[in-house]
Amino acid sequence: IAADSGTLSDDECYTVTNEINQAFVDTIRATGGNNENRFLLIAGFGTDITNTCDSRFVMPTDSADSKLLVSVHYYDPSGYCIMTSLSSWGDKNDYESQNETLEKMTKFTDEGYGVIIGEYGVLIEQNDLKDGTLDYYTNFLNNCDLYGYAPMLWDCNNLYDRNAGKIIYDDIAAFYQSRSVS
């Protein structure tokens, strides 16, 4: 703990996170049975891609071979995805930024870890898709396909009608249907 603030420094936060992740793996593996070999999902640092790719974040050691996966979230740029300060996406810089950020996670796939993007999405405002939403999703999912990541679309209670059991917006439903693997 930083002596002058009573809070953990960034380095200390990474150390504590790594210790918790190692304790998680050790605890699960020690219980025996199927837990000796089950897949375990390790949350990245703050579930943020850049922070998770920082050299201070270390995947735990594991007695099981190739059974650890790392999970992050992707809401970049936040002004577009989860806030209202950006209303469109799709210029050259947007594509480059998304591509560069997602490529960072190859640090883990190159080491044999699976990557799960446990949340991603673009907030829908006033029942209208933001300009470039389908382009954003297309490029994002193309990157996931390229690198072998498993993406999970997150619903902020305005995309999926739980009572009807379907996506509310026909263009988004058609988009995902067109990407389905049969």
Task: Give the residues covered by each predicted segment.
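Acidic-and-aromatic substrate-binding clefts and catalytic sites of carbohydrate-active enzymes
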Residues: 2, 46-52, 95-96, 123-134, ...
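Alpha-helix initiation/capping motif
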Residues: 48-50, 91, 122-123, 169, ...
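Aromatic-rich peripheral "rim/lid" segments of glycoside hydrolase catalytic domains that contact
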Residues: 62, 127-182
